[in-house]
């Protein structure tokens, strides 16, 4: 009876995947773990604080900050889907993940990645409307339009996750079940399949092109028009204000699209599994740390709102 149960448990365990993690081959695993944990806490605190500020401060109830709060929410979810499992696994020594857990991780990762790409396009259109169409801005970017744009971003991201996750998880994995990543990422998982996935890889590549092409067109068109208007401005102060309004967003666009292009569109023969893991760590851990810093330190409205909130809290304590 016990023997039968043990066999059943071994068979069940054999279906689990093993995540390599960031610390597997490192000689300074403890130091790397500490740095990752601190970055995780910084990202959680920074994005949560940014969301709290935007929703509690009436002066920040504008379309631009509404989109920034959604970006911060996506970054928070990104972190919570991928990083805690890796950190806990390093402490407990259990780096395994079940197929269902792997599928859930992959679905949320694809959903959030897709939604964030479209959200950046919506933010670029918002900047175009603010800089190039200031008189029509209240009409073009009213509350209903902003809510519809954000809802569309989430829906399109979910479509991406619902399309790719079931197909990826349906492939047989009869070779090593060791995923060379710290979370269940589609390219890393496909390398474990013992069936021919060349057609699916091509379809995934085309899907990525479609997912990235529309946002890239919107973003590039918006900023081309903005730069054209800035070039025609006579006022140096007006130029600086317009550039400051858009520069923060452009930094985030370059970071995310660069990482997405590298991971999903560059041929796998041009990069190693270790390089893939570093890029994944960059846009999963480092970018959520940078986003609040970029949008707060470079933004007088946010810093003013933060000082106001801290002063009100101090007055309440007195």
UniProtKB/Swiss-Prot annotation:
Cellular component GO terms, alphabetical: plasma membrane
Superkingdom of this protein's organism: Eukaryota
Protein topology in the membrane: Multi-pass membrane protein
Cytoplasmic side, ranges: 55-62, 126-144, 225-241, 298-318
Residues the record marks as carrying a glycan: 5, 10
Record function comment: Odorant receptor.
Protein name as catalogued: Olfactory receptor 2T34
Organism: Homo sapiens (Human)
Gene: OR2T34
């Amino acid at each position: 009876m016990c023997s039968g149960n043990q066999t059943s448990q071994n068979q069940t365990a054999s279906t689990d995947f093993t995540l390599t993690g960031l610390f597997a081959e490192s000689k300074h695993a403890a130091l790397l773990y500490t740095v990752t944990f601190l970055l995780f806490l910084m990202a959680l605190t920074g994005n949560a604080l940014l969301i709290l500020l935007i929703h509690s401060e009436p002066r920040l109830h504008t379309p631009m900050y509404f989109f920034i709060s959604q970006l911060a929410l996506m970054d928070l979810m990104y972190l919570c889907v991928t990083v805690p499992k890796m950190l806990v696994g390093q402490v407990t020594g259990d780096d395994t993940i079940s197929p269902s857990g792997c599928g859930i991780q992959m679905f949320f990762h694809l959903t959030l990645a897709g939604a964030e790409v479209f959200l950046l396009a919506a933010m670029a259109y918002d900047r175009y409307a603010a800089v190039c169409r200031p008189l029509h801005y209240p009409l073009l970017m009213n509350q209903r339009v902003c809510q519809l744009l954000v809802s569309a971003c989430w829906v399109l991201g979910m479509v991406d996750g619902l399309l790719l996750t079931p197909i990826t998880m349906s492939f047989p994995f009869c070779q090593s079940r060791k995923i060379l990543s710290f979370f269940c990422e589609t390219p890393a998982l496909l390398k474990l399949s013992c069936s021919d996935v060349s057609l699916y890889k091509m379809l995934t590549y085309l899907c990525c092109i479609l997912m990235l092409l529309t946002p890239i067109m919107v973003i590039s068109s918006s900023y081309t028009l903005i730069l054209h208007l800035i070039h025609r401005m006579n006022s140096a102060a007006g130029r600086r204000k317009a550039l400051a309004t858009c520069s923060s967003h452009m930094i985030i666009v370059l970071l995310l699209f660069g990482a997405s292009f590298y991971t999903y569109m560059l041929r796998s023969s041009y990069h190693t599994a270790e390089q893939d893991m570093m890029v994944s760590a960059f846009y999963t851990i480092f970018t959520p740390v940078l986003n609040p810093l970029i949008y707060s330190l470079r933004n007088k409205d946010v810093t003013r709102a933060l000082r106001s909130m801290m002063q009100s809290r101090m007055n309440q304590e007195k």
